[in-house]
Structure formats: structure tokens, C-alpha cells
Design a protein with these regions (language model features):
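Catalytic metal-binding/acid-base residues of hydrolase active sites
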Residues: 159
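Core AdoMet radical
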Residues: 25-141, 151-155
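Hydrophobic/aromatic ligand-binding patch that stacks against planar heteroaromatic rings
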Residues: 144
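Canonical Radical SAM [4Fe-4S] cluster-binding loop centered on the CxxxCxxC motif
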Residues: 7-36
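Catalytic cores of alpha/beta
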Residues: 163
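Short, small-residue-biased leader/transition segments that mark boundaries at the very start
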Residues: 2-6
Length: 166
């Protein structure tokens, strides 16, 4: 398993505005809020890792935002990939729908980093994920990253049972 799981929250709201997403009213404002104190977050993560040296643990991002989509503005992933390269037992998972792969070309692949893509049937995505890259574009990007040595994860999100007739 993934061991203890920690959500890393560096930003609120998402540019993709997917119609089913809980972020559609989660916060008082639809404005983006970016926390820029990455060093403080890294210090806290480091404390957790050192305190629980023998435990498996996963730190993920992409719950309250799409970290990869906003990377050109936040520089978050560029900052955290080198950080996690020092902690091989800690898994860093980046949850995304973005096809922005620029940051991954700047770094060597990490065995403890997973780029996890949310997927659903293309026809459903055209209805629900109108502002997000197409599923086929995401799959193409996953292949590109996998060929470069990055680990890929799949997240089937949302799981909807016949709520929409396609």
C-alpha cells in the first residue's frame, strides 16, 4: 500500500472548473489562492519523514487544485521534485489532468514520484471536463512521461454509474 497518506495543499481552486468537482463551492471565493511558503512545508514534511523513518508514506498534491496545470505560475513541482529526491522512502504523488510536461524535462525521473492522471471515458469527459485537456491528450502525455522514465498512476475519477446518458 501507500502507507500513511498526507495531502499537500499549496493552492486552492482549479482552472479546469470540472462540473462534478467538489471545489465548485468549497471555498468562499473562486479566486486562486497560492501558498508560497514552500520551505515551511518542506520543513514539516522532513520532520514527519524523520520521525517515522520505518513507515511507508505518501505525500500527494492535486486535491484542492491541479498542481501541474498551475506549475508555470507556482513553480511548486520544480521545487518539490528535488526535495523528494532526498527521501527515497517517501512517495510524492502529483494528481493531475494537465498535459504540461515542461517541469519533468528539467529533472531526472524519480522512483518515488508518481504522476497520477484522472481519467474517465472520453465522451463523459467532453461533458464534465470541458476545460481540461482531452482524455486522449492525457494518455499521450502519460506515454511521453513513461517513456522518459517517470512513474504513471491512473485515477478513475469520478466514478459515475449511468447518471448521464451519452
Amino acid at each position: 500500500g501507500l502507507g500513511d497518506v498526507y495531502k499537500r495543499q499549496h493552492m486552492y481552486n482549479c482552472l479546469y472548473d470540472c462540473s462534478y468537482c467538489f471545489l465548485q463551492g468549497m471555498y468562499n471565493s473562486a479566486n486562486y489562492l497560492v501558498f508560497v511558503n514552500f520551505h515551511d512545508y518542506q520543513n514539516e514534511i522532513e520532520k514527519i519523514i524523520k520521525k517515522h523513518k520505518e513507515k511507508k508514506m505518501t505525500f500527494f498534491t492535486g486535491y484542492d487544485c491541479d498542481s501541474l496545470a498551475m506549475e508555470p505560475i507556482t513553480n511548486f513541482i520544480n521545487d518539490f521534485v528535488p526535495f523528494f529526491s532526498r527521501y527515497k522512502k517517501a512517495l510524492f504523488e502529483i494528481r493531475t489532468k494537465s498535459i504540461n510536461n515542461t517541469v519533468f524535462r528539467k529533472h531526472d525521473p524519480l522512483a518515488n514520484c508518481i504522476v497520477a492522471y484522472s481519467l474517465m471515458p472520453e465522451a463523459l469527459a467532453q461533458i464534465l471536463d470541458k476545460k481540461a485537456p482531452s482524455v486522449s491528450a492525457r494518455i499521450k502525455n502519460m506515454k511521453y512521461l513513461a517513456n522518459k522514465g517517470w512513474r504513471i498512476g491512473l485515477r478513475f475519477d469520478p466514478l459515475i454509474l449511468s447518471l448521464i446518458h451519452i
